[in-house]
């Protein structure tokens, strides 16, 4: 089997364009959508779309990097290099973070042309951007190690990553959900990624920002340790 062609810059442009079109459509009916968390719905929506791209892009980068190496056979060069498991896992994850940073700033730039989007707290933005990208990069690393072919990766993306990012408050406030679903949302790491990043833009949130920071920090450590352990043991790559 052959790996797909490398990502083309046009792919990133298309993703940004889709987000822009989303915002334009919602702007057209924005007056009818009311106020969410103290801001117009369109200003509530934009940070959610940016957050969703950060989540999906950081996961896609690390997962495709590992799986491409496995399928093309050049991962043996990485395994046989003098780099430690710590160095390899962090290198792949930080590459995912770099991609997420580029996507986030491009998205903010495009959205600022069409809507009033402001960054209320730059420190929280940087912290949540880092934690979200780091944890999703580590999850992508794990998925890449586990997958044997692109169909396996598509299954993870389509049935886990995309649904969890959509069902984590991207398009709505969880206060509108039944109480049991609100409690379920609070244990979903994707919710805290989106909620924290949205807080940095609009200054209000659905959940506790302090709890979200601690939760994502611990979650990042856990998924990084799993990725480190799998690579160190040579899971599905030693053969």
Where on the chain are the PLM-derived regions?
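Hydrophobic alpha-helical transmembrane segments of multi-pass membrane transport proteins
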Residues: 40-111, 140, 159, 165
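Single conserved hydrophobic/aromatic residue that forms the stacking wall/gate
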Residues: 1-26
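Membrane-interfacial helix-loop-helix junctions in multi-pass membrane proteins
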Residues: 115, 165-222
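Hydrophobic alpha-helical interface/terminus motif in multipass membrane transporters
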Residues: 25, 29, 66, 75-78, ...
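Hydrophobic transmembrane alpha-helices
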Residues: 48-56, 130, 146, 156-167, ...
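Alpha-helical transmembrane segments and their short interhelical loops
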Residues: 85-157, 204-228
């Amino acid at each position: 089997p052959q790996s797909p062609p490398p990502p083309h810059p046009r792919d990133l442009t298309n993703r940004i364009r889709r987000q822009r079109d989303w915002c334009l459509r919602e702007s057209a009916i924005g007056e009818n959508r009311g106020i969410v968390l103290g801001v117009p719905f369109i200003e509530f929506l934009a940070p959610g779309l940016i957050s969703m791209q950060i989540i999906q892009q950081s996961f896609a980068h690390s997962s495709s990097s590992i799986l491409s190496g496995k399928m093309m056979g050049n991962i043996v060069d990485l395994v046989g290099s003098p780099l430690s498991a710590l160095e390899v896992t962090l290198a792949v994850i930080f590459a995912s973070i770099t991609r997420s940073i580029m996507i986030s700033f491009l998205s903010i730039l495009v959205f600022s042309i069409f809507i009033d989007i402001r960054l209320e707290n730059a420190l929280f933005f940087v912290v949540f951007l880092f934690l979200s990208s780091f944890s999703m990069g580590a999850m992508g690393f794990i998925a890449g190690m586990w997958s044997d072919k692109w169909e396996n990766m598509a299954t993870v993306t389509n049935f886990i990553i995309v649904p969890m990012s959509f069902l984590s408050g991207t398009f709505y406030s969880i206060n509108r959900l039944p109480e049991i679903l609100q409690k379920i949302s609070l244990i979903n790491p994707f919710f805290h990624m989106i909620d924290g990043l949205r807080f940095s833009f609009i200054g209000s949130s659905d959940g506790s920002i302090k709890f979200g920071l601690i939760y994502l920090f611990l979650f990042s450590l856990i998924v990084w340790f799993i990725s480190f352990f799998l690579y160190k043991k040579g899971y599905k790559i030693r053969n």
